[in-house]
Amino acid sequence: MEVSGPEDDPFLSQLHQVQCPVCQQMMPAAHINSHLDRCLLLHPAGHAEPAAGSHRAGERAKGPSPPGAKRRRLSESSALKQPATPTAAESSEGEGEEGDDGGETESRESYDAPPTPSGARLIPDFPVARSSSPGRKGSGKRPAAAAAAGSASPRSWDEAEAQEEEEAVGDGDGDGDADADGEDDPGHWDADAAEAATAFGASGGGRPHPRALAAEEIRQMLQGKPLADTMRPDTLQDYFGQSKAVGQDTLLRSLLETNEIPSLILWGPPGCGKTTLAHIIASNSKKHSIRFVTLSATNAKTNDVRDVIKQAQNEKSFFKRKTILFIDEIHRFNKSQQDTFLPHVECGTITLIGATTENPSFQVNAALLSRCRVIVLEKLPVEAMVTILMRAINSLGIHVLDSSRPTDPLSHSSNSSSEPAMFIEDKAVDTLAYLSDGDARAGLNGLQLAVLARLSSRKMFCKKSGQSYSPSRVLITENDVKEGLQRSHILYDRAGEEHYNCISALHKSMRGSDQNASLYWLARMLEGGEDPLYVARRLVRFASEDIGLADPSALTQAVAAYQGCHFIGMPECEVLLAQCVVYFARAPKSIEVYSAYNNVKACLRNHQGPLPPVPLHLRNAPTRLMKDLGYGKGYKYNPMYSEPVDQEYLPEELRGVDFFKQRRC
């Protein structure tokens, strides 16, 4: 369970205030410990001073302090309740201590200088403040806002925390020394990289193509975390492919931008952006002091839900604070578990956001569904998939190669640091977008697998052949992408709505005598993992319902196909089903029996009062008593007559009714 932090709570800002001994900022006493943990990472040992603005960017430029320095800072700062401004001698002494660990002694005025290479190398070794967008690192540049705040009065704790996070994220996409090296200058890109950045344009968030990364840097960025999670956007500006639901001027987007979030059920196929939209709502909620809690119905229990609701009641009663509860895979909760939300959604204790791949009409309690707004997210179009993939490719520093140009990037041996470490063919990007079938998660993870596999295979080849490994000559082709995905990502759920959609499409295609469409829907189901016996049972039904007496042998064909599937199974039985499907599509159709039987059922359901009794002459008379009561009296045994027998077989109340002529009671 994930819960948003209390940093922006206006109530907590009114509690007892204390001063941080490191950065001199005022904050509630309850948060001093967590603040010190972050503050000691951002400020090197020996540089505590009361000025709130000017020293902060300089300390970031020097990089995080070593673990030993952090412990010294903690022991020194804990003994100071109200530290004074250090003298020049004390400042020099503290900087000398830093120099013992490998740093250089520098005066306070040198804080504005760009970070040194050694400082930049320290950044990956220590945790940094959370970033608002994936793939971005802290910048070593001093922000202009920090320079202007050098002589400002001490800020409130909320303002200081906001600027610390803003400075930790940085302004650029590259490393802190990117501007100093000039590697982020578009003049250092080659022509194809510049064209790729221009083509990406505003759809990539307005950021330029990142600087060229070494192959090992790309490998490290892709290891340990799925690329789909790393590239998850935080804003609606980077949320692509769902313009119908959250596009400009839509009702939902207006509600999200004004932070008036209703209870929602997000329904759509896997990888269409349900969880990402909830993540964007969570990011926006934290800025407005709204508590956001995440649960997954796959592992959460009813007690977990009750605990969250109890906390939400306390937050609302004491702090007047809203709570948004996001339930992923909400269809995994049974009806009694879903009933737990009803009174609390009704009275506004929580705002419920549920995500599901199943039809809410079948899987979500009707009472709960009536209290939520259903947002249908469609499968991502190919254009949106290309944009999402290009955003990830640019963040990895991979250069898109125009297949129409004959230049081979592997033909030259330049080792310039600004040269891209990896290339990918533009047709490989298009192929990946098509094979992903609208699933952004499958597409991004397929890209990650293709990149890692290509790097590993080239490294192994160079090792076996005795050649020197040249990471700047790696090319990802269309075949690499196909091997990474193996086959098209087929969306099919044997227990969900797509299951019923496909069997309905097969049934209607055979009824319409379209043999091509019938084969397509059959293959779609079987390749998606459908049980062949289920399809065979439906064909038996079709033989009597839609073909009927127009071709009585169709029922024999269907039963034979079912038995054959039972005998040999998949994949051999697929041709048996295909033969039966084509036979049914070509066969004449008749619903005479099917319609007549439906008329009989309607007659029985609409009959008023008790059903009419069976006529006496049609009753069986196995005993003497029944014969004495008139059972079977007057019945004419038809085989004994050469001519048709004039005899009534329906109850007297139904005489004259012809169910085959579409007459209803």
UniProtKB/Swiss-Prot annotation:
Binding positions for Zn(2+)? C20, C23, H31, H35, C39
Database matches in SUPFAM superfamilies: P-loop containing nucleoside triphosphate hydrolases, post-AAA+ oligomerization domain-like
Zn finger regions (UBZ4-type) covering which residues? 17-44
Acidic residues compositional bias, start-end: 92-104, 159-184
Cellular component terms, GO, for this chain's entry? membrane; nucleus; perinuclear region of cytoplasm
Q: How is it modified after translation?
A: Sumoylated with SUMO1 and SUMO2/3.
- Outcome after substituting V18A: Reduced affinity for ubiquitin
SMART domains for this protein: AAA, ZnF_Rad18
Q: Which residues carry this modification: N6-acetyllysine?
A: K633
One function term, GO molecular function aspect: ATP binding
Renumbered to this chain, the signal peptide range is none
| Consequence of substituting L42A | Normal affinity for ubiquitin
Q: State how changing P44A affects the protein, per the record.
A: Normal affinity for ubiquitin
Q: So what does mutating I32A actually do?
A: Loss of affinity for ubiquitin
Crosslink position(s): Glycyl lysine isopeptide (Lys-Gly) (interchain with G-Cter in SUMO2): K482
Q: What is this enzyme's catalytic activity, as reactions?
A: ATP + H2O = ADP + phosphate + H(+)
Quote the tissue specificity entry.
Ubiquitously expressed.
Q: How does it assemble?
A: Forms homooligomers, possibly octamers. Directly interacts with POLD1, POLD2 and POLD4. Interacts with the N-terminal domain of WRN. Interacts (via UBZ4-type zinc finger) with monoubiquitin and polyubiquitin. Interacts with TRIM14 and PPP6C; these interactions positively regulate the RIGI signaling pathway.
The similarity annotation says: Belongs to the AAA ATPase family. RarA/MGS1/WRNIP1 subfamily.
Q: What is known of its domains?
A: The UBZ4-type zinc finger binds ubiquitin.
Functional description taken from the UniProt entry? Functions as a modulator of initiation or reinitiation events during DNA polymerase delta-mediated DNA synthesis. In the presence of ATP, stimulation of DNA polymerase delta-mediated DNA synthesis is decreased. Also plays a role in the innate immune defense against viruses. Stabilizes the RIGI dsRNA interaction and promotes RIGI 'Lys-63'-linked polyubiquitination. In turn, RIGI transmits the signal through mitochondrial MAVS.
Q: What is this protein called?
A: ATPase WRNIP1
UniProt source species: Homo sapiens
